[in-house]
């Protein structure tokens, strides 16, 4: 078992880039034999593929932090976060904090 800490700050692409960097460094450690073998404890976890329906934000009655995390973790290549308002659907592309304000980019369909 080889593990490395991973920050979950930033957008999904930022996290993926850090994962790739960590993976590369761990692969180098394995190739060079610089790791300690030990059996993994606990049970394996399996998750089904996320469906677009699971990306729906049912309401805006959540904290800004919750909405920020929901949108940023559902950016491409995953089905983007969206909310339905009347007959319109707003699909969120990104979210960020500017000072104390949550800013989002989206498309109205």
Please name every model-derived segment.
Residues 1-103:
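Active-site-proximal loop/hinge segments within enzyme catalytic domains
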Residues 103, 107-109:
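Generic C-terminus detector
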């Amino acid at each position: 078992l080889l593990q490395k800490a991973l920050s979950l700050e930033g957008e999904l692409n930022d996290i993926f880039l850090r994962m790739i960097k960590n993976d590369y460094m761990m692969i180098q450690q394995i190739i060079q034999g610089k790791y300690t073998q030990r059996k993994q404890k606990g049970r394996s976890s399996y998750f089904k593929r996320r469906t677009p329906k699971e990306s729906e934000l049912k309401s805006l009655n959540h904290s800004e932090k919750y909405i920020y995390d929901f949108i940023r973790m559902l950016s491409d290549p995953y089905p983007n976060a969206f909310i339905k308002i009347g007959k319109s659907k707003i699909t969120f592309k990104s979210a960020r904090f500017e000072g104390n304000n949550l800013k989002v980019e989206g498309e109205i369909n």
